Structures are given as structure tokens and as C-alpha cells.
Amino acid sequence: NIGIEYLIFKYRLNIYLEYFQKIEHNLLVIPGAKITDIKNVYSHSQALSQCSNFIKSNGFVAHVRADTAGSAEMVSKNNDIRNAAIASALSSETYNLEILKKNIEDDRGNLTRFLIMGKKISQPEFGNKKYITSFLFKLKSKPAALYQSLGGFAINGVNLTKLQSYPEKNSFDSYFFLCDLDGHIEDKKVQKSLEELGLHCEDFHVLGVFEADKIREK
């Protein structure tokens, strides 16, 4: 399971686009199988976690697999009514399985964010749209460095939507931070905020400027 942070740190990939997808999990079974036949359920660890209430309430034994589609394929090939997969509706069509229960996820409002990434840097022109600027930075080693570095965003009224820390390789006291903000890098408020941040940084790298997914407006 390769995380976005791995791709960014190892290959210095840039972000071109974001897309949010509503997560909908279904219980897929061999055609004709009933809920009382099911003993084992297979899926990706995240899908199993997102459907934990359903799994527990039915007394199923959860088995972790590499991905949801692969779980559906395995259940189809084994052709055992005691086995089920948690996967998408598309997987049911692909592997000739029946959807026994739809939308079994614990949180019906769960979303997953997908990013389109690549080597070259490309960004939309600054206009009358909602943008996200994503960047990576490493702070100078000093007390209260993170607190001081973020002050410029508050002063200039720039909203941070994401801030995640990652330890530098073979270090317990040096961290990189992955950050998203609302705004285009050519916006003066954003520029002033990043200039202030830069005073506290050893390393700074813009990962991408892209239009915000429309779901952020809801």
C-alpha cells in the first residue's frame, strides 16, 4: 500500500488535480447465497475497517486482502457460499457476483480523496475560482518553530485545510510537513503567508496549485 507521502518524498511528484469519491461498500456473494450462509468476509484492510459495525453485527470473520477487487475475484473463483467480499458494484459485474447488501459502510458520508500526480509542474492561471495550493516544508530546528511559522497564515487570513508531519529518514527530531491551503499561489495573501513561512524553513517545495474539487463548496 503506497501512500501519497511515499510518492512525494521518493519521486518528488507534483499534484495536478484532486477528486473526491464517495465511498460505497457492498457485500458481494456467490449468486444464490444467503446472509446466513456467510462465515468469512474478505477485503482491503481499510474497507474492513469502514464496515466494522456490519461485520461485527453479523458475526463474520474478517480476512485482510491486498485490495477490494482482488477479494471479489478470489470469492468468485473459490465459488464457496460461505465466503463474501466487500467491494464495489463494478466488481460484482466484473466477477459475476451478487450484491447481497448495499452501502454497508459505517459512515454513509465517507469520502476518499484522489490526486493526479506527475513529474512536470503545471498550474492553472489565477482567476475567479477556488484553488488549493499544496506544499512541503521542513522547519529550522528551534523551539516553537511550527507555532511561529504558521502565524503568517492567520495574519493574512489564509485557511490551512491540511497539515501532516512526517519524520525525516533516520531522525526523531526533524520533520517534514505536508500542507494544503485555500488559495492560489499568485494571490498576494498567499504569497505573504508563504514568505513568512519561508523565514522559518530549511526546505520548501510547492507540490501543486490546482482547482478545488466542487465538493468543497458544499
Task: Describe each region flagged by the PLM.
Residues 1-218:
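Domain-level signature for soluble enzymes in the chorismate/prephenate branch of the shikimate pathway
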